[in-house]
């Protein structure tokens, strides 16, 4: 094999349509656009969503909803998520860095879901009664 003998795979390169090159090609004169009308002219096409002057669908339908600035930014964390964390001291920042809670989280609460197999210390993170019992059962603690 030589560089000057390399060719693209069979059927991978289609030859482009050559329009306006005579009657015999089947795409001569009007180039497959037909006669007259907006679509036959150069630059003659409507914008996306245009309905011929009728009020477009995206403007006929009402706006819906809004993003509340006062929404709760409290998140739930499972025990199995804590088990996967590489650190032993867990606070809100550690949860955010690990991607368990989003960066805009204001508080987090550990819930009894799954199991925990290692000792962890929670700082500034809430926990339900069941989660507290599970954490303390494996030798962990909750510092509030």
Curated annotation (Swiss-Prot):
Stretches of the chain forming a coiled coil according to its record: none
Known function: Binds to the 23S rRNA.
Name of the protein this chain belongs to: Large ribosomal subunit protein uL15
Family of this protein: Belongs to the universal ribosomal protein uL15 family.
GO-annotated cellular components: cytosolic large ribosomal subunit
Gene3D superfamilies to which the protein is assigned, alphabetical: 3.100.10.10
Organism: Dechloromonas aromatica (strain RCB)
Self-association state and partner proteins as the record states: Part of the 50S ribosomal subunit.
InterPro entries linked: Ribosomal_uL15 (IPR030878), Ribosomal_uL15/eL18 (IPR021131), Ribosomal_uL15/eL18_sf (IPR036227), Ribosomal_uL15_bac-type (IPR005749), Ribosomal_uL15_CS (IPR001196)
Region of interest (Disordered), residue spans: 1-54
GO MF annotation terms: rRNA binding; structural constituent of ribosome
Keywords: Ribonucleoprotein, Ribosomal protein, RNA-binding, rRNA-binding
SUPFAM superfamilies attached to this UniProt entry: Ribosomal proteins L15p and L18e
Composition bias, Gly residues: 21-31
Pfam family, one: Ribosomal_L27A
Record carries keyword Ribonucleoprotein: yes
UniProt keyword annotation of Oxidoreductase present: no
GO biological process: translation
Superkingdom of the source species: Bacteria
């Amino acid at each position: 094999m030589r560089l000057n003998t390399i060719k693209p795979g069979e059927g991978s390169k289609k030859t482009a349509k050559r329009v306006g090159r005579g009657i015999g090609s089947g795409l001569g004169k009007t180039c497959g656009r037909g006669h007259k009308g907006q679509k036959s002219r150069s630059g003659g096409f409507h914008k996306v969503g245009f309905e011929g002057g009728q009020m477009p669908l995206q403007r006929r339908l009402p706006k819906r909803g809004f993003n509340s600035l006062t929404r709760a930014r409290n998140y739930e964390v499972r025990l199995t998520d804590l088990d996967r964390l590489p650190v032993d001291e867990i606070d809100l920042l550690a949860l955010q860095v690990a991607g368990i809670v989003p960066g805009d989280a204001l508080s987090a609460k550990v819930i009894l879901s799954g199991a925990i197999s290692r000792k962890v210390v929670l700082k500034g993170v809430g926990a339900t009664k069941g989660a507290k019992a599970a954490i303390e059962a494996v030798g962990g603690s909750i510092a509030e």
